[in-house]
């Protein structure tokens, strides 16, 4: 059976750009990276996280002051992989704007909320979902207890991050994340995950001149 990732990559369109040295071909995502646009798409896992972190660091090296745009369409995934992206967003110097296209669930919603203040956006038909972390463990009883304590520590840390970026109280975040909480774009704005719901290009943030 053919690797679905290989099939997908073969379908990525190429764009041709005219330069002083002739034509140059890029895959569409590399071309958009030149415009400082990053895509966080699909499940959050170590491979995707590493690529996203690398792109953030590259764009910072290119211009430490110019805005980076992050387009998010993700069901979430591995907490530590998501936190690697989150920490890098906070660590680098350029402001990172976030825009939800499709869905931002679980870790996807945390990354959406982690954008620069007043630069977090959602398209009108996007869906956002927040919840507490989940996991399953097996092994010796003591090890299971240690893993259970670790996931509780992660839950507390994630709650604190949501508090920081949404302006909600810790109790409100804890209650909201107790079960899967689905939000429309407008509800996510009212909750503090995004700053604005946009439906026109003219309202979308554009990179500032260096």
Curated annotation (Swiss-Prot):
<dbReference type="InterPro" id="IPR023562">
    <property type="entry name" value="ClpP/TepA"/>
</dbReference>
<comment type="function">
    <text>Cleaves peptides in various proteins in a process that requires ATP hydrolysis. Has a chymotrypsin-like activity. Plays a major role in the degradation of misfolded proteins.</text>
</comment>
<dbReference type="GO" id="GO:0004176">
    <property type="term" value="F:ATP-dependent peptidase activity"/>
</dbReference>
<dbReference type="InterPro" id="IPR033135">
    <property type="entry name" value="ClpP_His_AS"/>
</dbReference>
<dbReference type="GO" id="GO:0051117">
    <property type="term" value="F:ATPase binding"/>
</dbReference>
<feature type="active site">
    <location>
        <position position="131"/>
    </location>
</feature>
<keyword id="KW-0963">Cytoplasm</keyword>
<keyword id="KW-0720">Serine protease</keyword>
<dbReference type="InterPro" id="IPR029045">
    <property type="entry name" value="ClpP/crotonase-like_dom_sf"/>
</dbReference>
<dbReference type="InterPro" id="IPR001907">
    <property type="entry name" value="ClpP"/>
</dbReference>
<protein>
    <recommendedName>
        <fullName>ATP-dependent Clp protease proteolytic subunit</fullName>
        <ecNumber>3.4.21.92</ecNumber>
    </recommendedName>
</protein>
<dbReference type="GO" id="GO:0009368">
    <property type="term" value="C:endopeptidase Clp complex"/>
</dbReference>
<feature type="active site" description="Nucleophile">
    <location>
        <position position="106"/>
    </location>
</feature>
<dbReference type="GO" id="GO:0004252">
    <property type="term" value="F:serine-type endopeptidase activity"/>
</dbReference>
<dbReference type="Pfam" id="PF00574">
    <property type="entry name" value="CLP_protease"/>
</dbReference>
<keyword id="KW-0378">Hydrolase</keyword>
<dbReference type="GO" id="GO:0005737">
    <property type="term" value="C:cytoplasm"/>
</dbReference>
<dbReference type="GO" id="GO:0006515">
    <property type="term" value="P:protein quality control for misfolded or incompletely synthesized proteins"/>
</dbReference>
<comment type="similarity">
    <text>Belongs to the peptidase S14 family.</text>
</comment>
<comment type="subunit">
    <text>Fourteen ClpP subunits assemble into 2 heptameric rings which stack back to back to give a disk-like structure with a central cavity, resembling the structure of eukaryotic proteasomes.</text>
</comment>
<keyword id="KW-0645">Protease</keyword>
